[in-house]
């Protein structure tokens, strides 16, 4: 009996003893635990290409290769850090975003995490044909960049402000907003509450013909601050906190405390006119998502009350900025899959479905029938 018990205990605890005793490259440490050594392996950075026959994938942080869906064999190389032209070089990339026309690639480097879904990084524009690199911006690290549908512009956020880079004008940079301030005003990027509760980061979008840009503005100036200590022994090491712990403060509203005041704004890229969209919203209401439809004059806006039991979908013209409600109804008071809304633009296989209807419409994911279903509204 004792032998059987010992055998069972050995089987149960031997993996734990092995893991706690030795990591892959030596004794178990804080660095090995937090550095990804024990993460599950997977396939990342796979992006289907326009030909429908192949896909691109980042390999070893240095190359973006093209492979065949049918055979899995490599058929080409889109980017090789060791084989570029010009003076600007990068030795390693953390990720990439292909332009819609696949002529350029945004290369992500020097990535730094902020919260669960947000990062800052230094991005470079890579010209596939010329094999040349150019920095997206010289003004500091960027957040949540987005290609325009025509592939000729890139929008991004830096320090709470929204910027636009025009590739056809020698990468000229336009600052759209100027009121961004840490722990006060954020343009085009979700605050902590929205990032955590609605699983969103980027809060701006281009319209289909790349003439307008819309974004959500978060005023968190009245949200209470939360502070937690920062120690030297954290990873990465904070030597400045060797003798006394430092502190990090950010806006964190507990139940009953004020949320950010949110509003929707548009920017006419040609005239540079900025407008506020007149969205009917409760004082403590949310705007979890905005997105342009395949019609460049229709901006979809999702709103929700703070109790999260009622949601509405509005459609607005980005220039007159008037809204009309096209869907209203009860919602689950929780977000089971955290995204529960699905705005579809003219891309991928959904483009064929929308074209087949020959009318304006959008897809909406909802639990209103007690089972998660996708609805098409027109």
Locate predicted features.
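Short loop/turn segments that connect beta-strands within beta-propeller blades
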Residues: 69-72, 127-131, 167-170, 268-272, ...
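Blade-terminus and WD-like Trp-Asp/Gly-His loop motifs, strongest in beta-propeller folds
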Residues: 46-53, 59, 96-104, 145-153, ...
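Structural motif
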Residues: 61-66, 115-122, 159-165, 222-228, ...
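Beta-propeller domains
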Residues: 57-83, 113-114
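N-terminal low-complexity segments that are often proline-rich with Ser/Thr-Pro
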Residues: 347-378
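Predominantly five- to eight-bladed beta-propeller fold
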Residues: 110-115, 119-122, 176-204, 212-276
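Asp-box/WD-like beta-propeller blade repeats and closely related beta-sheet repeat scaffolds
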Residues: 116-164, 169-203
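Surface-exposed loop and turn segments in beta-propeller and other repeat-based domains
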Residues: 30, 34-35, 77-89, 174-196, ...
